[in-house]
Amino acid sequence: VAFLTHLHSDHTTGYPDLIFTPWVLERDTPLKVFGPAGIKSMTENVLEAYGSDIRYRIDGSEPANEIGWNVEVDEIDEGMIYKDDLVEVIAFKVNHGSWENAFGYKFITADKTIVISGDTAPSDKLIEISKGSDILVHEVYSQSGFDRRSDVWKNYHSKHHTSTIELAEIANITKPKLLLLTHILFWGSSEEHIIDEIRSNYSGKVLVGEDLS
């Protein structure tokens, strides 16, 4: 099962790999995908673009199964979108500038609550839904790096993303047991400097996320 926050290219260029590589490695069930409006069309276009590859693997000498390349897509709105024996998933809209359909997700298990911000400027809805979470995974940009940007980029980033100073304020309100930083815009800063900027206004536990580690 996969959950997409929004359809910006930096969040979707790996989508074909997510569909096809596990199938090549013998996944024999469809991939289940939840995402915003537009994900159905994107999925159809990806499958069409790779049509020759799919047909070759199924009809040629490669013994690929005929099921694992399929995708079952649900276009979501806010609220509970998924539940099984292990986890309940709640989607909520976030403030990613003028991008209409951007979501965060709250994952609830028997012993943990994890909130993923997606791409967002400071969001009252995210603050409310993430209060008391075990882990808050939140995007961030360096305030000192931002200060060196041009005015036109400052205007863009301030409406689409969250600074270290703003995130410290959010964490002070929501009080997660762990604040995990992701989608970091460094602009010449280091991981250590990003952490220091947050810790200047927040005393809780904070770590830089490392994908696939």
Each predicted region: which residue ranges?
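Binuclear metal-dependent hydrolase catalytic cores
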Residues: 1-115, 193-213
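Cap/insert and terminal regions of metallo-dependent hydrolase folds
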Residues: 103-104, 111-113, 121-212
